[in-house]
């Protein structure tokens, strides 16, 4: 059976850590940031861990499962 292709859009959005967590960027940061608080924008800069319910689906998109 051939290898499963990696979904390229998912590969650009998600990173897998050494511990197996999947990290993602926050939304709501690309434009219209003038009305958002500075603290909010700073928090949105950080990475976030993908929830366990979505983890298996993303791993399949990345060709890891």
Curated annotation (Swiss-Prot):
Family under the similarity heading: Belongs to the bacterial ribosomal protein bL35 family.
InterPro entries: Ribosomal_bL35, Ribosomal_bL35-like, Ribosomal_bL35_CS, Ribosomal_bL35_sf
Name by which UniProt lists this protein: Large ribosomal subunit protein bL35
Gene Ontology molecular function: any one: structural constituent of ribosome
PROSITE patterns: RIBOSOMAL_L35
NCBIfam families named in the record: rpmI_bact (TIGR00001)
UniProt keyword terms in alphabetical order: Ribonucleoprotein, Ribosomal protein
GO terms of biological process kind: translation
A single Gene Ontology CC term: cytosolic large ribosomal subunit
A Pfam entry, by short name: Ribosomal_L35p
Keyword Ribonucleoprotein among record annotations: yes
PANTHER family: 54S RIBOSOMAL PROTEIN BL35M, LARGE RIBOSOMAL SUBUNIT PROTEIN BL35M
């Amino acid at each position: 059976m051939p290898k499963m292709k990696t979904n390229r859009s998912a590969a650009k959005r998600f990173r897998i850590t050494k511990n197996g967590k999947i990290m993602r960027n926050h939304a709501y940061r690309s434009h219209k940031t003038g009305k958002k608080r500075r603290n909010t924008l700073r928090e949105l800069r950080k990475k976030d861990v993908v929830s366990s319910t979505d983890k298996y689906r993303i791993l399949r998109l990345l060709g890891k499962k």
